UniProtKB/Swiss-Prot annotation:
Organism: Mus musculus
Acidic residues: compositionally biased ranges: 441-450
This protein's name: ETS translocation variant 3
SMART domains cross-referenced by the UniProt entry: ETS
Listed PANTHER family: ETS, ETS TRANSLOCATION VARIANT 3-LIKE PROTEIN
Role this protein plays: Transcriptional repressor that contribute to growth arrest during terminal macrophage differentiation by repressing target genes involved in Ras-dependent proliferation. Represses MMP1 promoter activity.
Amino acid sequence: MKAGCSIVEKPEGGGGYQFPDWAYKAESSPGSRQIQLWHFILELLQKEEFRHVIAWQQGEYGEFVIKDPDEVARLWGRRKCKPQMNYDKLSRALRYYYNKRILHKTKGKRFTYKFNFNKLVMPNYPFINIRSSGVVPQSAPPVPTASSRFHFPPLDSHSPTGDVQPGRFSASSLSASGPESGVTTDRKVEPSDLEDGSASDWHRGMDFMPSRNALGGGAVGHQKRKPDILLPLFTRPAMYPDPHSPFAISPVPGRGGVLNVPISPALSLTPTMFSYSPSPGLSPFTSSSCFSFNPEEMKHYLHSQACSVFNYHLSPRTFPRYPGLMVPPLQCQMHPEEPSQFSIKLQPPPAGRKNRERVESREEAVRGSVPASAPVPSRIKVEPATEKDPDSLRQSTQGKEEQTQEVDSMRSRTIEEGKGTGFAHPSPTWPSVSISTPSDEPLEGTEDSEDRSVREPGVPEKKEDALMPPKLRLKRRWNDDPEARELNKTGKFLWNGAGPQGLATTATAAADA
């Protein structure tokens, strides 16, 4: 292979997945447009010789820093056969990935980006083996280290009964599968396929699980032979030889259980079109008796997954739904049926017109507010003033002209009778409304207004009367007092309450004068 702009070396031998030819374009090939920029960045990050150019950020999951932007742009231009490439053009291409949720810029740090690993799925090549040489597949997310394996080995040829045993981990299960791994062909394990010491690490990290013999021999004979499955789990953190890997520390410590292997956060739990278990027959989760997780380990793992995703402002990853796998709920999620710890207090609606009138009338009863005349103390006996009132009215009627004497005398008599009946009875349920006669002379109008100002606040109102709306008070007064009704028919009767009605009385008196 030419040592041109292609950085990834094509793996030799039968081990590993054989990628298509366009993934290994040489310098002479025009454009090499099949590779994407984020694939190229992952290739640079996996190469030891480019640590001075681009490297993972220590202590941050999926974060990398471009140490030499011009050199990265030059390498990218050489790969794409574009010698005019610079970092401005490359950064525009990186900004395109922001909307695609492939990576995003780290705020506050120059030339620092972070991959969204839960968004990087493998739609094209679900059968992937990551060799220790650091080969990164063209459409796959990055994995923790180059030493970890993720592949589907062929069927164990030494099985005596020929039944499907997906749970057996042996030396043959450590072999790498080719593109024909889903076919019935078997091949022997080559010692060169295994790295030095990696097999012993895997044997130490895995426990043997019981084989499923529940299937009958006759039924197995008609089934298609399927390969064993090496679970997409990763070895202990102590086995990671790469000091530059951001995944050197697993969030879950190793615990005793069926699988004594900590789960790496690089394993995306987003269900994809091609999941890691291609069919129900190949799935290791089909039977709870064959495969089970430690609930405590799963709880810690899912909690760390959710917390890391929530910190990145991403949607949480959903665990694939398998019937035999019991996943405990997250502690950080609140169930909708649980009552909220904060009680919701509803405020009353704003007071309408009637409620406002009730409040105003209550305030007037408390304050003892009076019309625009001189303020008077709220509690004054009104009997002397009312006894003096008929005499003053008689004196005023004597000084009138002859043409109005009869009408005024009749009016004064009816007022005296109304006042006499008002004080003969106990205090009614409605506030007493004083009746004034519109006089022709302005002096008499002032006397009436003074008497009215003394009379009105003197009558104590009950609490229920203060709360009663004015319309209801008028209606009750109208229904209980037939004399007032007769006076109103003649057009000479006016209610003399507080507010505009009192002003109307004064205006009528001035008009008669």
